[in-house]
């Protein structure tokens, strides 16, 4: 089979502490459901001459590609604030694929069976959550947000027992890497400085070679990740994305969004929005995502202390100074992001007040977060009656005055707004409808959503139904992690 796989498995060459060698557990009757041909092309992979039967074997793990070397990665994590040793309990990294341009991508099977890290789990995944990760990760990519992507989904032909009996599935995830803050926590917990140094050098070599010659690699790695994760959470806030399970094992060192378990997009603007059924106290609510980002980065910094300086007090001082810049950096980036969403060029001292007035009005009137910005661009939306409001008109007058500052024009502002305000997001009720149909063998709506979400900033009025929130508020909408 000439597909174009070219594996160079650098992580497999790390010491045994970092991973366990394990093959995917074969499944009975794999059936390919989705193959992401656009992503395959980006990876320089050609599946055009491969029949569905062989595709099913490849993406179920029943037939591993030549050159692959499958492993389960070890990591730890703070899960809702509580530290625990974890690891890939239902996934295997089959290898690192190199494209013709020497770009390196992890290829991982999720739902591929038990591993030494499975504990009491069955190592399997359910069809609905795997399709959900596929569609939302692809949507995030086209929203211009760093993310893992999905290459394929295969039904296993086997039942999986959760709250009910469901169809089993395996997702093929593609990522710049699967190193997590939790990877560093795992190695740090072993208190082996040599392994920690190996991990830092490996991380810099793979992701951040520009700091390879740094005099303080550990400190510079901390600074790089602070910057990466600050920008990532800004992007989430921009589109109303709520990750739902921001445990340290779900914070990627590459700066990608990873692990789409109970995530969802906010419809009605409410900063306290939580969708995850297990987040009863709202730890990972929309408004808390920046704070949790810093909390996770602090856990990362703790791992690096021994290599920031041999003097522990000095190391803590340097790490704290780096972390203390987070709030101001986030505030500056958030303000600039919101200026872009409102088409505001330049800076005015009243900008934050103007932004907060709008957000407070949206919260009070239960206005849709995405559609409010679409409405301000003079685009057609359904259910625009909420904007027929005296307070909104008063705010809009102030906004229009601010738009023309610095010699700006309304048309120029709309161009700026159009580049960062999506016309369409993965609406929760539409995702659920598509998944319900897909579970019954009908992928029509799923494929339609994928097609539209590939161009989120350019949507026709004919797609108004897919742009609109649920007929009733999604206050009671809940998501589940699928494990």
UniProtKB/Swiss-Prot annotation:
PANTHER family: PROTEIN ADENYLYLTRANSFERASE SELO, MITOCHONDRIAL, SELENOPROTEIN O. Its EC number is 2.7.7.-, 2.7.7.108. It comes from Pelagibacter ubique (strain HTCC1062). It is an enzyme of class 2 (transferase). It holds the Pfam family SelO. It comes from the Bacteria. Its cofactor is Mg(2+); Mn(2+). ATP binds at residues 87, 89-90, 110, 122-123, 173, 180, 259. This is Protein nucleotidyltransferase YdiU. It catalyses: L-seryl-[protein] + ATP = 3-O-(5'-adenylyl)-L-seryl-[protein] + diphosphate; L-threonyl-[protein] + ATP = 3-O-(5'-adenylyl)-L-threonyl-[protein] + diphosphate; L-tyrosyl-[protein] + ATP = O-(5'-adenylyl)-L-tyrosyl-[protein] + diphosphate; L-histidyl-[protein] + UTP = N(tele)-(5'-uridylyl)-L-histidyl-[protein] + diphosphate.
């Amino acid at each position: 089979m000439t597909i174009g796989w070219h594996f160079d498995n650098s992580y497999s060459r790390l010491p045994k502490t970092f991973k366990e060698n394990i093959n995917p557990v074969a499944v009975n009757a794999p059936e390919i459901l989705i193959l992401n041909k656009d992503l395959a092309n980006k990876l320089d992979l050609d599946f055009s001459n491969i029949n569905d039967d062989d595709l099913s074997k490849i993406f179920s793990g029943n037939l591993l590609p030549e050159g692959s070397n499958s492993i389960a990665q070890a990591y730890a994590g703070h899960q809702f604030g509580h530290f625990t040793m974890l690891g890939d309990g239902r996934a295997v990294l089959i290898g690192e694929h190199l494209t013709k341009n020497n770009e390196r991508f992890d290829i991982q099977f999720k739902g591929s069976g038990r591993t030494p890290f499975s504990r009491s789990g069955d190592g399997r995944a359910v069809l609905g959550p795997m399709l959900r990760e596929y569609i939302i990760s692809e949507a995030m990519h086209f929203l211009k947000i760093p993310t893992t992507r999905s290459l394929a989904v295969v039904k296993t032909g086997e039942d999986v027992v959760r709250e009910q009996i469901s169809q089993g599935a395996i997702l093929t995830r593609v990522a710049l890497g699967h190193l997590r803050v939790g990877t560093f926590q795992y190695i740090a917990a072993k208190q082996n400085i040599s392994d920690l140094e190996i991990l830092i050098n490996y991380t810099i070599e793979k992701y951040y070679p520009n700091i390879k010659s740094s005099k303080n690699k550990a400190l510079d790695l901390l600074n790089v990740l602070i910057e990466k994760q600050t920008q990532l959470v800004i992007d989430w806030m921009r589109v109303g994305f709520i990750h739902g399970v921001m445990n340290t094992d779900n914070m990627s060192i590459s700066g990608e969004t990873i692990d789409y378990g109970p995530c969802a997009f906010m419809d009605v603007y409410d900063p306290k929005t939580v969708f995850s059924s297990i987040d009863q106290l709202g730890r990972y609510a929309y408004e808390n995502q920046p704070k949790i980002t810093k909390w996770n980065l602090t856990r990362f910094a703790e791992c690096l202390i021994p290599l920031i300086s041999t003097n522990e007090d000095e190391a803590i001082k340097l790490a704290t100074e780096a972390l203390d810049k987070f709030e101001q950096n986030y505030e500056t980036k958030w303000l600039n992001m919101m200026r872009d969403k409102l088409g505001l060029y330049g800076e005015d001292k009243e900008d934050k007040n103007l932004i907060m007035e709008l957000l407070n009005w949206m919260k009070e009137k239960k206005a849709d977060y995405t559609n409010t910005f679409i409405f301000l661009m003079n685009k057609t939306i359904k259910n625009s009656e909420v904007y027929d409001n005296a307070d909104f008109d008063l705010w809009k007058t102030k906004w229009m005055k601010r738009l023309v500052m610095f010699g700006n024009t309304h048309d120029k502002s709309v161009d700026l707004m159009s580049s960062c305000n999506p016309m369409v997001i993965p609406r929760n009720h539409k995702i659920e409808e598509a998944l319900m149909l897909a579970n019954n063998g009908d992928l029509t709506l799923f494929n339609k959503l994928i097609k539209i979400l590939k161009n989120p900033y350019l949507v026709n009025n004919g797609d108004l139904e897919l742009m609109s929130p649920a007929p009733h508020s999604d206050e009671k909408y809940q998501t589940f992690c699928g494990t």
